[in-house]
From Swiss-Prot:
UniProt cofactor(s): Zn(2+)
Annotated stretches, region: Plays a crucial role in substrate specificity: 112-115
Paired cysteines (S-S): none
Biological processes annotated in GO: proteolysis
Major enzyme class: hydrolase
Protein name per UniProt: Pro-Pro endopeptidase
Length: 217
């Protein structure tokens, strides 16, 4: 009988202790990013790559799961994105909206195809791009195309684009010119931080409401 009591006590102890070691939501999110993100095989800035992964956590886990189910990979590259085998066809090609700059895809730090490729150390605005955050912006292009069925091309979003894209991006020839770019940048503002979300709400309220409905599901 004493042995039975010990067994019961042990089982109870295990039941109490185990929840303490259950994987938190943060760990689950890291897990899907470990599946999505491909790191360079050679030398690279480990701390910056880790920071990029951490920023990608701002994208809802359900959306990251959907990207993974579509076979998407997010490659963090040490060198030019066109050095990646999947993107070699872009060498020497001028990106849309970059005409007359003298630059090609070899100079651009990020792209979103079936593979999302972003250069390590180029996350911030002004480092070869004008996005709030490079890795989030490029990943959200893939979300738009592959998870949200090109929601940036719907009549509802085009109408919002026509009304509000010029509020912050007038004359930039890029975000204000292409609904896909406006979507990726506006969605970045919505997801990046409380401050950027508040700014989106104040300056582009129709866009904010669209994003709020979109990411509520």
């Amino acid at each position: 009988m004493k042995w039975d009591k010990r067994v019961v006590a042990l089982i109870l102890a295990v039941m109490i202790v185990c929840p303490l070691f259950a994987a938190p939501a943060h760990a689950q999110e890291q897990s899907i990013l470990d599946k999505l993100v491909v790191l360079p095989s050679g030398e690279y800035n480990h701390s910056e790559a880790a920071a990029m992964k951490q920023r990608l956590e701002k994208i809802p886990t359900s959306i990251l799961d959907a990207l993974y189910s579509k076979g998407v990979k997010i490659k963090l590259t040490q060198g030019a994105i066109t050095n990646e085998p999947e993107l070699a066809y872009l060498k020497g090609v001028v990106p849309r909206g970059w005409e007359g700059t003298g630059l090609t895809w070899d100079d651009v730090p990020g792209v979103s195809e079936r593979v999302v490729a972003v250069r390590i150390g180029y996350s911030e605005k002004g480092k070869g791009h004008n996005s709030l955050n490079l890795e989030i912006h490029e990943t959200l292009h893939a979300v738009d195309r592959l998870v949200l069925n090109e929601v940036s091309g719907t009549d509802e979003f085009i109408n919002i684009f026509n009304k509000e894209a010029s509020v912050k991006y007038k004359g930039d020839g890029y975000v204000s010119a292409y609904p896909t770019e406006y979507f990726a940048e506006a969605a970045s503002l919505y997801l990046y931080s409380d401050a950027t979300r508040s700014d989106l709400k104040d300056s582009m309220p129709l866009t904010y409401e669209f994003m709020a409905k979109l990411f509520a599901n």
